Regions:
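Cytosolic juxtamembrane helix and N-cap/initiation of the first transmembrane helix
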Residues: 2-32, 158-161
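Interfacial segments of alpha-helical transmembrane regions
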Residues: 17-29, 79-93
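C-terminal TM-helix exit segments that contain a strictly Trp-centered aromatic cap at the helix terminus
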Residues: 34-42, 91-114
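Canonical alpha-helical transmembrane segments
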Residues: 63-82
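Hydrophobic alpha-helical transmembrane segments
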Residues: 64-67, 125-150
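Membrane-interfacial helical/loop segments at transmembrane boundaries in membrane proteins
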Residues: 109-129
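Cytosolic juxtamembrane helix at the C-terminal end of the final transmembrane segment
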Residues: 150-171
Length: 172
């Protein structure tokens, strides 16, 4: 095993302190809150459009919260791996939201949101219903996730580096 592998193993085996856990938990909760705000906006859109969100879509949408929930679990258990799960959560969730709403989802499971925001702004026919309208609130609550996730990722990576350097310095 190389020195860097031993250092990484030591790092991953070390519990984070309360202050560090609190710091990255705030960022993780900010990512979750941004995702929740975005999903709340979908409810607002559905009401505005008189669109009934199918039950299976509610269930499938829970997948968005898997990574932030895993991050929260790891943070609460003071695991040093929580730094990177917060980073992963921010990147994956932001990328997925942007892909679905600016381009097209990979699978057609998102109901009316199988159409991107540009098409929805012009109007689309979906299951016999004409749906039109994307406003500034929709755009703001789409972009809130990357706006929160980018600083969350940077802060988590920076804190990880500081924590690891401190650990390795104290261990020598």
């Amino acid at each position: 095993m190389t020195k860097s592998q031993k250092d990484e193993a030591k790092f991953l085996d070390t519990r984070i302190d309360d202050e560090t856990a609190s710091f990255i938990e705030k960022w993780n909760l900010a990512i979750m809150a941004a995702a929740l705000l975005h999903d709340a906006d979908h409810i607002r859109q559905a009401v505005k459009w008189k669109y009934k969100i199918p039950l299976q879509l509610w269930i499938i949408n829970l997948a968005v919260y898997v990574l932030p929930t895993v991050s929260e679990f790891l943070i609460r258990n003071k695991r040093s791996s929580s730094f990177m799960t917060v980073v992963s959560s921010g990147i994956v969730t932001s990328a997925a939201f942007l892909k679905v709403h600016l381009w097209k989802p990979t699978t057609d499971i998102w109901g009316v949101w199988n159409h991107n925001y540009f098409k929805l702004a012009k109007g689309v026919w979906h299951e016999g219903q004409f749906i039109k309208g994307i406003d500034w609130i929709d755009w703001a609550l789409l972009l809130d996730l990357p706006a929160v996730s980018i600083p969350a990722c940077i802060a988590s990576l920076k804190k990880r580096k500081e924590f690891k350097e401190k650990l390795l310095t104290e261990g020598k």
